[in-house]
Regions:
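Conserved class I S-adenosyl-L-methionine
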Residues: 1-43, 56-60, 77-80, 136-174
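Class I SAM-dependent methyltransferase SAM/SAH-binding core
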Residues: 48-50, 54-97
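A short acidic, Gly/Pro-enriched loop at the edge of an enzyme's catalytic core
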Residues: 96-107
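A short SAM/SAH-binding and catalytic strip from SAM-dependent methyltransferases
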Residues: 107-120
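A short glycine-rich, Lys/Arg-flanked "PGG" loop and its adjoining helix->strand segment in the class I
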Residues: 121-133
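Acceptor-substrate binding/catalytic loop of class I
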Residues: 145-148, 179-193
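Short alpha-helix
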Residues: 187-209
Length: 241
């Protein structure tokens, strides 16, 4: 989430169309059913969504009566967020330098944005800094084995059946261009230990971890495929009081 060309500005229209109002399969059927209850659980008064994109999750939280600020470095996405939620609070900013006072928020959300942030060694301490003591950092992220396979995907047999999902260079951090459904952006791969060390070094305590399964109303074929290679994890980290 810096000034470098990461593809997000040119991919913004395709991204917005792909998300719609309800999100893609992973958000709608896997992550939202966990992320929304976790976000509401402690009745936070002030929430920051880091890497809010076009503002979909901000709108979900605002419909629940929360005071939400969304930040993103991509002008087109912030413009779309403001257009869809004229009463909302959205700002162009990077995760590595949050323009907020210390201890300003009860809850900070990173909803599939860590993979887009070039410098998490700067960003995670910033998220911890703006949390009040006792506040939570709620994270949805891609499993690191998934980002170690972004250029390969499923290996298929001659009949087109999915055989296995290979990973390579898992311990080597990298930034890779990925393309899907008209979107072309940079994703950052890091081993799980990189994220955990950064969160622990920021003084945060892990209080919740899940690899959520699709909800019962998810499309059956996609749910079966997800069960073979689950893409997502959810973590909640608390700043000690």
């Amino acid at each position: 989430m810096s000034g470098m060309d990461n593809g997000w500005e040119t991919s913004a229209d395709a991204w917005i169309a792909d998300m719609g109002e309800h999100g893609d399969f992973g958000r709608r059927y896997v992550l939202d059913p966990v992320m929304l209850p976790r976000a509401l659980r402690q009745k936070p008064k002030k929430v920051l969504d880091v890497g809010c994109g076009e503002g979909r999750f901000c709108r979900m939280l605002r419909r629940q009566g929360l005071e939400v600020t969304g930040i993103d470095p991509t002008p087109a996405l912030i413009a779309a967020a403001r257009a869809r939620d004229k009463a909302g609070n959205y700002a162009r900013a990077t995760a590595e330098l949050l323009p907020f006072a210390n201890e300003a928020f009860d809850l900070v959300v990173s909803y599939l944005s860590l993979i887009d942030i070039p410098d998490i060694q700067a960003a995670i301490p910033e998220m911890a800094r703006v949390l009040r003591p006792g506040g939570s950092l709620l994270i949805a992220n891609l499993n690191s084995f998934n980002t170690a396979c972004v250029n390969t995907g499923w290996i298929k047999g001659s009949d087109g059946q999915r055989l296995y999902y290979p990973i390579d260079n898992y311990l080597q951090e990298s930034a890779t261009w990925i393309e899907y459904r008209g979107i072309r952006v940079i994703n950052h791969h890091r081993p799980m230990s990189t994220y955990l060390r950064a969160l622990l070094d920021a003084g945060l305590h892990l209080t919740f971890f899940d690899e959520p399964v699709p909800s019962t109303n998810a499309p059956a074929a996609k749910a079966r495929g997800y069960g073979r290679v689950p893409w997502f994890l959810v973590m909640e980290w608390v700043k000690p009081a």
